[in-house]
Amino acid sequence: MLENIRDAVRKFLTRSTPYEKAVDEFIKELQKSLISSDVNVKLVFSLTAKIKERLNKEKPPSVLERKEWFISIVYDELSKLFGGDKEPNVNPTKLPFIIMLVGVQGSGKTTTAGKLAYFYKRRGYKVGLVAADVYRPAAYDQLLQLGNQIGVPVYGEPNNQNAIEIAKKGVDTFVKNKMDIIIVDTAGRHGYGEETKLLEEMKEIYEALKPDDVILVIDASIGQKAYDLASRFHQASPIGSIIITKMDGTAKGGGALSAVAATGATIKFIGTGEKIDELEIFNAKRYVSRILGMGDIESILEKVKGLEEYEKIQKKMEDVMEGKGKLTLRDVYAQIMALRKMGPLSKVLQHIPGLGVMLPTPSEDQLKLGEEKIRRWLAALNSMTYKELENPSIIDKSRMRRIAEGSGLEVEDVRELLEWYNNMNKLLKMVKRRRGSIDKLFGGKIG
C-alpha cells in the first residue's frame, strides 16, 4: 500500500489543484496508505500533525516552490518515522567477530544467516556458519545447503540436542581456523507471543558465547506487532540490532519498520527478496525516497542538499567576519557547487557577488555573462592543487600559467578569480560583526 504514496506525490507535484486543497488531499492519502500498511494509528496522526505544524511555523526557502517544500517536509518526517539519520554500523569492530542470530520460528532466520554470510564474504571476510538450531530438524540441512551454495563452511552436529554445546564448539573451531566472522544460527522454536522463552534462551546462549553482536530477525508480515518483540529484545540486549525479512512479500513492511524504529532499536538490514544477495543495509532516507518515488523527488532533495551545503559555507563566512579563520578557494568552490544545485541559473546568479547580475531581474545578456564566468571559475578551481585551494597566496605567475593551461583558460581569467577572492576576504574583514551583512553581500537570504 505504500506505493500509493508514490502516486500521490506525482499527482501533488503535477496537478494544478490549489495548494491548500492539494496539501489536505495528500495528507489524507498519506494517512490512509500508512494505516493500510499497518503503521500504528497514533504514529500516523503524530506524523501528520508534525507536518502540519511545520507548514504553519516555517517558511519555504526561495530556492523551492511551495509544493516542493511541502514534499521535502514529508520526506524529512517520514524518514524520522522509520529511524531518521541513524546509520547502522555493519563493519566488525574486531576480529574474530561473533554474530548471534535469534528469532521466532518462520521469521526467515536461517535464510538470513546465509545471506549475512554472503554479505560479509563479498566484503572480503572469511566467514563461518554455526548451525545451533536443534529444534527444527531441517535447520542444519538448510544451513549446510546455503553454505555450500556460497562457499562458506558450516559447523553442525545433527545428532546433538545441546544447542549451547554446539554453539561453543562451533565458535571454538572457527576461531582456531582463523575465521574473521562467525555467525551462529540459534533455535527458533517459539512462536510470536512466546517472547519470554525466546529471550531466556537468548540470554543463556549469550552468556556461553559472549558474542559481539546479537541480531533479532523479524518477519515484516507481523506489522506493528513487531513493537513488543523489538522493545523487549532491545531492553534485554543493549548491543543488539534487528533484521527485518520478507519486505518484498507483505503490505505490512512499513508497519514493522516504524514499530521497530519507535523502540529505538537499530534496524541493521532488511531482506528484500528470496535470492542470497537480497539483503541490504537499512537506510531510512533511502527507503523513504523509494516510497515517495525517487525520480519525482530527486531534484527536490538535490535543492535541499544544496541549501544545506550553502548554509555551512555561510556559517564559515560568519566566522571569518568575526576574525575566526579565513575563506579559502576551496570554500568558494563548495559555495558555487552548492548554489548550482539549487535550481535555475537566474536564481543562482543573484546570490553570487561580483558577477554583475545583482539586479532583481537580470537581463538575458547578464545571465549569459554570469554563467560563462562561473564556468571559467570552476574550470580554474578544478585545475588547482590542494595546497593552492587551501592557500591561494602561493599562486604566483608561474602557477597562474599552469592553472590556465590545465583549464583551457587565459591567465587573465585566473587573475580575475584571484582578485575577486582577495576582495571578498577584505570585504568580510570590513563588515565584521554587522548583522545582515552577509545577506546583503550575497544578494539576499536563501533560506
From Swiss-Prot:
Subcellular location as annotated: Cytoplasm
GO terms for biological process, alphabetical: SRP-dependent cotranslational protein targeting to membrane
Q: Name one GO molecular function term.
A: 7S RNA binding
Positions of GTP binding: 103-110, 185-189, 245-248
> Which Enzyme Commission numbers does its entry carry?
3.6.5.4
Q: What span is annotated as the signal peptide, if there is one?
A: none
- Offer one Pfam family short name for this entry: SRP54_N
Which Gene3D superfamilies does the protein's record reference?
P-loop containing nucleotide triphosphate hydrolases, Signal recognition particle SRP54, nucleotide-binding domain, Signal recognition particle, SRP54 subunit, M-domain
This entry carries the following GO cellular component terms, namely: signal recognition particle
What top-level class of enzyme does the UniProt entry assign?
hydrolase
| Keyword set, alphabetical order | Cytoplasm, GTP-binding, Hydrolase, Nucleotide-binding, Ribonucleoprotein, RNA-binding, Signal recognition particle
Q: What binding partners and quaternary form does the record give?
A: Part of the signal recognition particle protein translocation system, which is composed of SRP and FtsY. Archaeal SRP consists of a 7S RNA molecule of 300 nucleotides and two protein subunits: SRP54 and SRP19.
Q: Which family does it belong to?
A: Belongs to the GTP-binding SRP family. SRP54 subfamily.
Write out the function statement from the record: Involved in targeting and insertion of nascent membrane proteins into the cytoplasmic membrane. Binds to the hydrophobic signal sequence of the ribosome-nascent chain (RNC) as it emerges from the ribosomes. The SRP-RNC complex is then targeted to the cytoplasmic membrane where it interacts with the SRP receptor FtsY.
Which PANTHER family would you find in this protein's record? SIGNAL RECOGNITION PARTICLE 54K PROTEIN SRP54, SIGNAL RECOGNITION PARTICLE SUBUNIT SRP54
What name goes with this protein?
Answer: Signal recognition particle 54 kDa protein
State the species of origin: Saccharolobus islandicus (strain Y.N.15.51 / Yellowstone #2) (Sulfolobus islandicus)
